[in-house]
Amino acid sequence: MTEYTNLPVKWTNGIVISDERMMLDPLPSEVSAVLDAPINYSYRYNELRRTHSLKLFGVWSGYIPSHADKHLMIFQLLQQEKELTGDEIRLALRQMQGSIKLPINDKLLDSLDRYSLIFAWIAYAGCLDSAFWQQVCADPKCLVYNPDDNLKFSLMFSLARQYSATTRICSADGLRIPSQISPDLGQLAFDLVFNSSVRQTVWFHANDFPAFDFYTKDVGTMVTFHVNFLYNMTHCVPFKTKQSCAEYLIQKAHEAWSVYCGVLNDTIRHRLRLVEGVGIVTLDVDLQILAAVGWYLPLLVYTIRSVSGSDISEWLNVARREFRDLNCSSMINGEGYVGVPEQFWTIHATSKARMWPRVKKYTCDLTDLYNGDLSSTVLGEGASETGTVKWFDVPLGPKVENFRVVGTRIGALSRANVIYNYEDPSDNCDLARAIGSFVPSLPTSGTRDTNGDLEDAKKMFDYRVSQNVYSICQKGKISSLVSRSVKNLRASLMNGELRVYKGSRLWALRAMLFSDKLRYKSDGQVIDPYESHRGKITVRLNNSSLKMLSAFVTLIELAMAQSSGVEDNMLNGRGLSPLQVRSDREVSRVVIAGAINEPLVGCLRRMYPKLSVIGFGMDAVGENERLTVEGASQRNLACDMLISDIDQTFYSDFTKMCNVTVKHALAFSSWSDYVLMKVNYPSSHLLNEIKQALLSRGFSRIVLPVVMCGQNSFTSEVFVYIGRAGVGGHVDFKNNWFTKNDILMRRYRHMKAPLITIPQVVHSVVSKCVTKHDTELFANPGSIVALTVEYASAREVVSLISEVCSPVWTWRTGAGANKFVNIVGMPSKARAALTRRTDEHYYLKAFERNIVGTSFGMYKGIPRIDALNCVSWVTIFGAAMRECLYWIVDTLKVQYNEVISIGARNMTDIEFIKPSVKLTCYDEYYANPQDLATHYNVNYENKYFNWLSPTLVNDSVYVANFVIMAPTEGSESPSATEQLDRIDSVAGAMAKSSITRMTFVGNLYDSRFLADIALSSLPPEGLKVNDTRTTVQIGKYPPCAAVKPSAFLERMKKYKGVLSYHVYPLGYDRVLKTCADNLWIPDVAGSPMLAFCQGLSYAFYITKPAIPDEGIDQFMLDDMPDDGSGSVTPTQSPSPSPSPSAAANTEASTVVEPIDNLNVVSPTVPGQPSQTPVNPNQSTELQSVAKPGIVR
């Protein structure tokens, strides 16, 4: 680093982190226009306290009122004790805009320098009482600056010294201004510039700050410095009390946490600052420690995880406890040093500019930090695409002859012309149907198996969620997914478009969304709200609101074992009214545990005015009670129903977490006969401990974990029903115990320690005309192709982009005057795999017609492009199974020249097939198969596959994804025996001597988990099961018989020695991989079914030549460490389970779970090493041997 030796204090070349707030400062000529634009604001009125809150945003956020502004209409209105209307506020703000002018003069209007809004608003507020600020207003040249100048505002600081307006802090002179530069106008606080009670910030000119004495011995000094500096100027905040300084440091730590979340998630959004930590000069060790928390990320993560709220003593206790393990004590010295992680250092380039002099760079693996509690901000609902054209066509037109991309004017699409939504797409779902829908996971073992149960649960608790898993899991936040549905439902209810009847789920939603008192007609129909109340009764929802309402409905249905029914708002039986969990009396009291400011409390009071509803929690506010479960011994919480949303994620010790969760379950069960409690770590051990503790205390209870609509799409949490009765009387499982292979336990394990590689979603924009051979485009999912091209070349460029992307959006922003077409494409592996089968390029068939000015769309606004897609769980299920089948083919390392895909209607298999491999598809419905044959060498057979007399091809792979159970034309769905006959027929043909090398992979429905789904209240959209007849019906297809895995294995026994065969379960990690690969989010109604994809179907394989007999059964069951080439190498004996560090690594091991209770032996595969050495970097303490076991 360069050292500046000519300064009073040695300065080193520190990190320069740009503060983009400078870019918000306008040119002097723009000041009038930006101040006159409509003001963005937020307004709230507290009916209980009769107080207003009004905050301004944008250029007006820095406005500080003075006594001269008291006469303005806005401040007169804010003194009234009633809620203001939007029209009143907007009119008053317009009047304020006309009255307030910032200091500017005509001499500056031609300047290209920037105008400092921060100092301008201070000058405006201070000019009445300060000679210095009066002079600044008289000469507004003081307020402009050159962004490239290292000595900004020299004139203003010179005036400050002349008028004795500077203040001395630690031997350096600076300019003191209020820290509160964006006040709440509802507080009616004036003259903040000179109010000594307001926290002040001292700004230093670049020539003055080197005199600052970092080594002050004054025990009363408490000065903090921000790590990134607006205008490249250092500023500090002096404090008078230790309490206020500590609160400030914790606030900055919370802000640093938010920044860390954004960087860790690779979230692309406009950020004003990228580091929020502060340096501190003080001799107080406690404050030094709190400052270190904000910028030393390991300490920050562990503190945030362990402390609820901003309790100073708790922050200090946690921080001190972690010092010895985190090796950061040397960085705490109270001399103003700031720690910056190496990742931030490399992301934001260093510079020779004189900046923060005391920066320490340290190494910290961000992805290695546990991030289970991180939350990302969602962008809200998507915008209309009206006016754009969305292309899905495969290029099947004429050849593109002699087109050269190099000669075409192609540029990057300006961000001013498009909005990219990298967060959650909005799902316009039927909330009335979805709310309260749940699917249970039944216990399956007649006895409790404690062999390795505790150890496995501890390891899962300690595993750190990998960055790859975390990134995709953060994409399914329920509040964003339902934003469009909530908005539309609110409008429909307010406009009287829906009839709402008491007792329906729509009634429950109505009570959640609006705060007015419910009024009814004689038939139970809810009367529309008063006209004067509309717009004032909207309830603000949080991310848990719909989940808690869903939990309430779920608890009723579990307890009463009766569907409340809401198809078209019609009731099934009594619905939700009256509220009963026993037939002899109505519910009189409901308790909500873990409430903070829980909207469900008010919702239930509106639904049931006579009901007593108590919300309590350790962070409760408002009408809820600040109370803990442990501290409730003197509070009567006996109730009819109890719902707990208490988190366990802040516990860092497994034993403590487990003990507290069990104690809570016991307490809740003593207060209520019907409980639904959240469990964040649903291991079989913990659920069995709850069950065991209840039995030991003499409680006869059903213990049943469920997942519900309303939870985040990819959460691993469950809600555990603990009830005296219910579940439709189906209590044959009541005495069963949970195993780690039950559905929701498997989901939990696969999320904490995925057994296959899940890709990292990396959002990026590619601004070039990509071709089908640009393989780097698919290195990680998340890329977007965005460019602007001349209209004359748009046909060719859109056609070429369509070879790689699907869909592709196009639009023009004007007719005639605009000669360019904007193009945005989503890269598609399937599309690129298809078009790579030839070196030729083809037009879209649509371009065979004449192209006119509107052919590419006309759009005058800014379109919003969703980088993610909300899709049905059925789509995810089918794609995950397809990926699983081709993974099996790769794992078997078979050689083949042709793939025969049976039932490949949409060429969904194409992305897994190399361009050099011949592809034949059997599907009776595909249109124009000849075009695919001539353009891309894909042979389509428009007919059913002949299952009973198959003609097989040597050196081939046959793939049957969800077709073995499908009927052929004119026939009914095959029974389980008939499905096995189909497989047997293919296997018999394979066994003939004419076939020397061939592999057959497919899937069947599994009968073992149908009871779980059959007990769901409203089966997810597109699914019907009959656990008595063991049938599954998806979509509009007829019911299909399920087949036990053991039946398949029994039927194949006769081919042992000639063919190799086995079954393989679909894991939840493969479901996550499918969602990440395709940028998919499950729709709200079907998201609970994602976990049950694991048990609804299983894969099988049959291959020839046979794998040696001694290894056949175990081949697909043992751990298979990834050899780094994308293939999987079988091992001779079970491999260690991945350690936490290995689980977090993107090169995660591939581990296969057993699917049945089989007598298996170790494999020996020709040409493969017999054993893979253990990674020496893995922790031996956390390794365990994977053992075959029973799934169901």
UniProtKB/Swiss-Prot annotation:
Residues 1140-1150 have a biased composition (Low complexity). Residues 1159-1183 have a biased composition (Polar residues). Residues 1112-1192 are annotated as: Disordered. Keywords: ATP-binding, Capsid protein, GTP-binding, Inner capsid protein, Methyltransferase, mRNA capping, mRNA processing, Multifunctional enzyme, Nucleotide-binding, Nucleotidyltransferase, S-adenosyl-L-methionine, Transferase, Virion. It comes from the Viruses. One of its GO terms (cellular component) is viral inner capsid. This is Outer capsid protein VP2. The lineage of its organism: Viruses, Riboviria, Orthornavirae, Duplornaviricota, Resentoviricetes.
